């Protein structure tokens, strides 16, 4: 049986592990976090990505985890409602659409559950070195003993360790978009009822939306700065920057900054894209944000990750023992769709205007997935 190690147990990694296992691979998953990484924003599964969930037998379960958000309010700095929208929301788009909006960690839990019977998980560990001799890849880990695998899949996100080890430094491939954003869990102190509330200040944005049947909420804070560089691992520097920029901008920012410091799942990063001419080298391939991050601003990151995992595993199956052909066909089948979805980020649109919904839907549905 062919062996593969997948690095990164988020959406792309767990989906790839599922499909590789289903297609006959012995799969090992390595994840730096001690368990599944908690938290994350509301994410969307759209168009053909819904077909991927259905083929995994997870569509009904994903629908059960929908946020069921009914709409959004937009307020001034004193909390007075300026207007409300019951047709679409900033996080999920049209309210009455076939798309599924759910929390990131809920989707990952579903994917993890689907892989558990057949996938070996190495939590609290990471790949240290990769040595591809043409016949196999020798992988050393920070904790586990070194092993050899037929293939290595990097699904370890925007700041991919596998990409760095095989292709080189992140700066070669990253396109920074200038928006810095934080997301974290807070109590539902606004008593939101399947609802979102947003305030746009002069230079910052803050939003809160209810989660888990109104028992808690997610907070989002964001600002624009094309010159700022903060290490994505330096939480204290992130806290300080958010405090400096947000404290005077009104609404409930003071409460959010208070909750921020004790949140169990605080996440902060600059919105970025990863642009690569190729997603594989030798016996190593990338999937999801590691190879072609669209950024959360595209609204398509999760769907692209699910589709990429499905197509990567499917093309490897179709190619039999010829992994090079499988990797090449994965790129040929998918790179056009990736490019169209990366184009969705508004800095590509004249004047930064929102993309018309019709054009967005055209791009979402601009791929037909095969039966592998």
From Swiss-Prot:
One of its GO terms (molecular function) is FAD binding. InterPro entries: FAD-bd, FAD/NAD-bd_sf, FAD_aromatic-hydroxylase. This is Uncharacterized protein MT1298.
């Amino acid at each position: 049986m062919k062996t593969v190690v997948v690095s990164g147990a988020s959406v792309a990694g767990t989906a790839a592990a599922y499909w590789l296992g289903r297609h006959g691979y012995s799969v090992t998953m390595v994840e730096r976090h001690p368990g599944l990484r908690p938290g994350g924003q509301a994410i969307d599964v759209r168009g053909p990505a819904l077909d991927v969930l259905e083929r995994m037998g997870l569509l009904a379960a994903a629908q059960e985890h929908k946020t069921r958000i009914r709409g959004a309010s937009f307020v001034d700095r004193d909390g007075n409602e300026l207007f409300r929208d019951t047709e679409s929301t900033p996080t999920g788009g049209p309210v009455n659409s076939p798309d599924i909006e759910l929390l990131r960690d809920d989707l990952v839990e579903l994917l993890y559950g689907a892989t558990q019977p057949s996938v070996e998980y190495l939590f609290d560990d990471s790949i240290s070195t990769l040595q591809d001799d043409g016949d196999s890849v020798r992988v050393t880990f920070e904790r586990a003993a070194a092993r050899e695998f037929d293939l290595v899949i990097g699904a370890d996100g925007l700041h991919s360790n596998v990409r760095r080890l095989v292709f080189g430094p992140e700066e070669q491939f990253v396109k920074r978009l200038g928006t810095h954003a934080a997301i974290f869990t807070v109590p539902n102190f606004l008593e939101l009822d399947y609802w979102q509330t947003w305030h746009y200040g002069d230079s910052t944005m803050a939003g809160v939306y209810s989660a888990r049947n109104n028992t808690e909420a997610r907070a989002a804070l964001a600002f624009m700065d094309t010159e700022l560089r903060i290490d994505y691992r330096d939480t204290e520097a992130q806290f300080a920057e958010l405090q400096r920029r947000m404290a005077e901008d009104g609404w409930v920012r003071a409460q959010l900054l208070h909750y921020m410091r004790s949140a169990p799942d605080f996440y902060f990063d600059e919105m970025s894209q990863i642009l690569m001419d190729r997603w594989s080298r030798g016996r190593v391939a990338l999937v999801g944000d590691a190879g072609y991050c669209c950024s959360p601003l595209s609204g398509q990151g999760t769907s692209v990750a699910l589709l990429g995992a499905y197509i990567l595993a499917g093309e490897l199956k179709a190619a039999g023992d010829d992994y090079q052909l499988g990797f090449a066909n994965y790129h040929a089948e998918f790179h056009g769709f990736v490019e169209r979805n990366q184009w969705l980020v508004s800095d590509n649109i004249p004047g930064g205007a929102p993309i018309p919904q019709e054009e967005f839907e055209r791009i979402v549905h601009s791929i037909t997935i095969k039966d592998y």
